[in-house]
Amino acid sequence: MTQVAKKILVTCALPYANGSIHLGHMLEHIQADVWVRYQRMRGHEVNFICADDAHGTPIMLKAQQLGITPEQMIGEMSQEHQTDFAGFNISYDNYHSTHSEENRQLSELIYSRLKENGFIKNRTISQLYDPEKGMFLPDRFVKGTCPKCKSPDQYGDNCEVCGATYSPTELIEPKSVVSGATPVMRDSEHFFFDLPSFSEMLQAWTRSGALQEQVANKMQEWFESGLQQWDISRDAPYFGFEIPNAPGKYFYVWLDAPIGYMGSFKNLCDKRGDSVSFDEYWKKDSTAELYHFIGKDIVYFHSLFWPAMLEGSNFRKPTNLFVHGYVTVNGAKMSKSRGTFIKASTWLNHFDADSLRYYYTAKLSSRIDDIDLNLEDFVQRVNADIVNKVVNLASRNAGFINKRFDGVLASELADPQLYRTFTDAAEVIGEAWESREFGKAVREIMALADLANRYVDEQAPWVVAKQEGRDADLQAICSMGINLFRVLMTYLKPVLPKLTERAEAFLNTELTWDGIQQPLLDHKVNPFKALYNRIDMKQVEALVEASKEEVKAAAAPVTGPLADDPIQETITFDDFAKVDLRVALIENAEFVEGSDKLLRLTLDLGGEKRNVFSGIRSAYPDPQALIGRHTIMVANLAPRKMRFGISEGMVMAAGPGGKDIFLLSPDAGAKPGHQVK
């Protein structure tokens, strides 16, 4: 089916320029790159861009700590980020920075248009001020309890638990992240974007098909609670763009960050000497398509503020937001101490990029589900699918073609009907790539790979090769196998760019989506070289070890005043000091399927979440009753792999056992994360 070529602009969320790229980041960039590569294969004009998010107080303070300028720090970080993305073969057409002249000009233009149209309001506000550091505190440098859901240890601009946004002054019991001091109130004039004026437009846009259903439903909750005016200014000292005609006032980082999409594209157009495309893509009535791939943690900014800013400044809105979930490793949050907080560069020191690209792709769908990188499953799947099913299909046929037929394939297909089965799958697989149902696409491709290998098994070319007078049959069978390999690799081309390059070199032809309609007949292939190597758990172990920032000593045995048990043998104070007891909030409690003794507890230690299995089910038949309670846990107990998952600590309880188990709780006033001394 012939497709009409489309003009498409694709972006990924801008990585913040104060830290390295890790495997959590890579999920989004791989997802977008696979989609972009598919679009290019179908003949569409795609511009794929990104940039570093380079402004804000965190950058300013970190540069001060390093003894360098913010400009120097973000320059070095940009080079590191670009190296990592190139290592994973992310095919960006341009990678820029929000700290650029293009972004400054566009930020000022959008601000001026919003102001001219009456959407910028000035008012004096009472703002939190750090008396020890002598500075107003940006949202992310104040932490406290969320005023909406009462979750502790939340930042001053939005809650990571319930997703609500609010002013830092609304936080309960705020603290300065910079000094730990309790902030004081000081007056300051600020500029506000009148978001409520766009409520009707945003509600219509929400239901226009521009958002996934899960996102649209979440936005409806925000509409029902009412939209608030958005503070878009920050006081000096601040690293960013100064607001025109407002000395000492700077654009809030979340105003100029999404404008960075426009700035990066403008930079690309200027590099090309193209004075037309920027307006063609960004004008109000543009027919080009604009897609933002983002994580679920920044939906609020991209689904409310960003389209409203564009609407109010006479630019086009996004065609769609493609939102994904988080990455866990081995069923738990990425952990530096366990070696599962893995940087992109560390991964590339131990594995190739295609392996992770394939694993993520096989697990992705159009939904906002979290993706678990199970390292053992990763090894098994890469070996089973890429090596055993796909690459093996080429290797088991290429030898005969090279040795017996000088690399020349047969002049006709041995099984045209089977080949047509493979090419007919292009529509289903293509639709899966298009709709971001990547896991479905991979399943369809691997089902074809099974079919291809079954054909080779049944035809047994290694047997035919030994039979006199069957050279033509041998050539036909192996040529069929190689043609099926070609179709499979064409379908996988968006996912496996490096393997594709090697396959194209062997096949002596470029792999194109439409090209598979014509099989390779009477065609000379090149001598076969190993296309892909098996991986093993030793590489995983080396990766994890390299990722560990520190190895924690095993926790000492815990003693306690259990009523019916004698006091244990005396220990030294130093022994006891090894045990790190912390106050924890029970965020969730549930039964463990397959166990009549355990409850699964989700604990909040004041910024870090832990998954703990506890044998207290007999005493707490209704686990929901535990939710919201504070308890005491051993926070530095080495994680323990259990049949049901990994337990990341131990909660403290007293009693002889059975129904007589009593979970310990701290006195009123203790907060999650407080150390028990």
UniProtKB/Swiss-Prot annotation:
<dbReference type="InterPro" id="IPR002547">
    <property type="entry name" value="tRNA-bd_dom"/>
</dbReference>
<dbReference type="GO" id="GO:0005524">
    <property type="term" value="F:ATP binding"/>
</dbReference>
<dbReference type="GO" id="GO:0000049">
    <property type="term" value="F:tRNA binding"/>
</dbReference>
<dbReference type="GO" id="GO:0004825">
    <property type="term" value="F:methionine-tRNA ligase activity"/>
</dbReference>
<dbReference type="Pfam" id="PF09334">
    <property type="entry name" value="tRNA-synt_1g"/>
</dbReference>
<keyword id="KW-0067">ATP-binding</keyword>
<keyword id="KW-0820">tRNA-binding</keyword>
<keyword id="KW-0436">Ligase</keyword>
<dbReference type="InterPro" id="IPR001412">
    <property type="entry name" value="aa-tRNA-synth_I_CS"/>
</dbReference>
<dbReference type="InterPro" id="IPR029038">
    <property type="entry name" value="MetRS_Zn"/>
</dbReference>
<comment type="subunit">
    <text>Homodimer.</text>
</comment>
<dbReference type="InterPro" id="IPR014758">
    <property type="entry name" value="Met-tRNA_synth"/>
</dbReference>
<feature type="binding site">
    <location>
        <position position="336"/>
    </location>
    <ligand>
        <name>ATP</name>
    </ligand>
</feature>
<feature type="domain" description="tRNA-binding">
    <location>
        <begin position="575"/>
        <end position="677"/>
    </location>
</feature>
<dbReference type="Pfam" id="PF01588">
    <property type="entry name" value="tRNA_bind"/>
</dbReference>
<dbReference type="InterPro" id="IPR012340">
    <property type="entry name" value="NA-bd_OB-fold"/>
</dbReference>
<dbReference type="GO" id="GO:0005829">
    <property type="term" value="C:cytosol"/>
</dbReference>
<keyword id="KW-0030">Aminoacyl-tRNA synthetase</keyword>
<keyword id="KW-0547">Nucleotide-binding</keyword>
<feature type="short sequence motif" description="'KMSKS' region">
    <location>
        <begin position="333"/>
        <end position="337"/>
    </location>
</feature>
<feature type="binding site">
    <location>
        <position position="146"/>
    </location>
    <ligand>
        <name>Zn(2+)</name>
    </ligand>
</feature>
<dbReference type="GO" id="GO:0046872">
    <property type="term" value="F:metal ion binding"/>
</dbReference>
<dbReference type="InterPro" id="IPR023458">
    <property type="entry name" value="Met-tRNA_ligase_1"/>
</dbReference>
<dbReference type="InterPro" id="IPR004495">
    <property type="entry name" value="Met-tRNA-synth_bsu_C"/>
</dbReference>
<feature type="binding site">
    <location>
        <position position="159"/>
    </location>
    <ligand>
        <name>Zn(2+)</name>
    </ligand>
</feature>
<dbReference type="InterPro" id="IPR041872">
    <property type="entry name" value="Anticodon_Met"/>
</dbReference>
<keyword id="KW-0694">RNA-binding</keyword>
<comment type="similarity">
    <text>Belongs to the class-I aminoacyl-tRNA synthetase family. MetG type 1 subfamily.</text>
</comment>
<feature type="short sequence motif" description="'HIGH' region">
    <location>
        <begin position="15"/>
        <end position="25"/>
    </location>
</feature>
<dbReference type="Pfam" id="PF19303">
    <property type="entry name" value="Anticodon_3"/>
</dbReference>
<dbReference type="InterPro" id="IPR014729">
    <property type="entry name" value="Rossmann-like_a/b/a_fold"/>
</dbReference>
<keyword id="KW-0862">Zinc</keyword>
<dbReference type="InterPro" id="IPR015413">
    <property type="entry name" value="Methionyl/Leucyl_tRNA_Synth"/>
</dbReference>
<feature type="binding site">
    <location>
        <position position="162"/>
    </location>
    <ligand>
        <name>Zn(2+)</name>
    </ligand>
</feature>
<dbReference type="GO" id="GO:0006431">
    <property type="term" value="P:methionyl-tRNA aminoacylation"/>
</dbReference>
<protein>
    <recommendedName>
        <fullName>Methionine--tRNA ligase</fullName>
        <ecNumber>6.1.1.10</ecNumber>
    </recommendedName>
</protein>
<dbReference type="InterPro" id="IPR009080">
    <property type="entry name" value="tRNAsynth_Ia_anticodon-bd"/>
</dbReference>
<keyword id="KW-0479">Metal-binding</keyword>
<feature type="binding site">
    <location>
        <position position="149"/>
    </location>
    <ligand>
        <name>Zn(2+)</name>
    </ligand>
</feature>
<comment type="function">
    <text>Is required not only for elongation of protein synthesis but also for the initiation of all mRNA translation through initiator tRNA(fMet) aminoacylation.</text>
</comment>
<dbReference type="InterPro" id="IPR033911">
    <property type="entry name" value="MetRS_core"/>
</dbReference>
<keyword id="KW-0963">Cytoplasm</keyword>
